[in-house]
Amino acid sequence: LAEGYSKEDICGGLAYSIVNNYLDRVVGTRAVGEKILFQGGVTHNVAILTAFKSRLGKEIIIPQFFSVTGALGAALLTMEEYYKTKVQEEILEDINQEELVEKLFLRNYTGAIDKQKRTIGIPRVLFLQKLFPMFNIFFSELGYNVVLSEMTNEKIVKLSQEYSLDETCYPIKLVNGHVASLIEQKVDYIFLPSLYTMKHEVSKMREDYACVYMQTIPKIVSKVMGLEEKGIKLLSPALSFNFGKKYMMKTLLKMGLSLHKNPIKVVQSLKKGMKALQEFEKGVEKLGKDLIEKLSKDEKVFVIITRTYGVVDKGLNMEIPKILKKMGYKVITLSHLPAHSMDISNEYPNMYWPFGQHILSGAKIVRNSENLYAIYLTNHGCGPDGIISHY
């Protein structure tokens, strides 16, 4: 003022100095886009806004609530941190549930080896992912050591590749790897049944056949692995649940007698095994029920739809459920839905594959539920899956 400059020039100079200071010291050498969002309390100063327009020559957009965008940003960051913590708690809860299922599965399993006893190896594959609690008790009560193969890991996958001769589906290829890992542990027997039918109480289907590989897997493994040459006996009873409990008792009694066990002891051991399986199934069912009850009606949930062993085996599901949970999504599986208690024989009378019945039942439940979204997991080379995916 003393030198004769007007107030307008001085204010304009201050406005330009603020703009130049920001561009030189804050923006620096970084590129400036074609559209600029101008926000914060400084936006009230029209002189600074005009100086920015003059200096940059670009479009400047002013949001409606420009003076409180900082507060809005702080609120968004707070909300993000809150839900991040909440998601972590939910992930821990889900992990805890997985651990509880694993504890139920292995409740009566020790893996201890008594050198005075012979050892039976059970591969952790296919339907044995569900039936193991029964056969673990059965063989333990008959006086055997029981060894369960590990969860599918890199070593087992490599062994599967080494011993796979025919072009089969991935779950069947993994059987070779699991059996090979048991052979390395020098077991005396490999227990791997044939599964012909799997009847469920509510099903009114004309037939309930397992796939051809489940029916023939013991023969495939015996040939590929050369069990007889290695001095390992294969125990492969033919399981057919369609024929009822009496048939199952008769089949497993025959196997027990081939092991030179007392028939009364065999029956007693089998009953204890069946009880253990029922307890396992009820325990898993309760965990699933508790999880679903915690979900709100409008909460969006992913449902993993696949076969039982596809849900349990991380090598088959590629840990997709875990990845989704880490992303903050709620995830449940087909076993958490009442799919096993639905009869779809009127709609699909020729769906002879039991797993297919469950998958279609689950898909029907998801279709009729606004908050459920299905993720269908299949494995390379599965024939029935190739057909079901078109439904």
Residue ranges with predicted function:
Residues 1-23:
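Adenine-nucleotide phosphate-binding core of ATP-dependent small-molecule kinases
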Residues 13-15, 37-42, 61-71, 150, ...:
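Active-site nucleophile and cofactor-binding loops and adjacent substrate-binding regions
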Residues 17, 28-55, 66-67, 127:
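Glycine-rich phosphate-binding loops at beta-strand->alpha-helix junctions
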Residues 26, 47, 55-56, 69-86:
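Hydrophobic/aromatic-enriched cytosolic interaction surfaces used to assemble or bind macromolecules
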Residues 32, 57-58, 227-230:
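Short, well-ordered coil loops that connect the C-terminus of an alpha-helix to the N-terminus
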Residues 45-47, 70, 383-387:
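Short active-site-adjacent structural elements
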Residues 53-72, 143-155, 334:
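Conserved phosphate-binding/catalytic loops in two-lobed NTP-binding clefts
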Residues 77-391:
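An N-terminal assembly and electron-transfer interface module characteristic of large anaerobic redox
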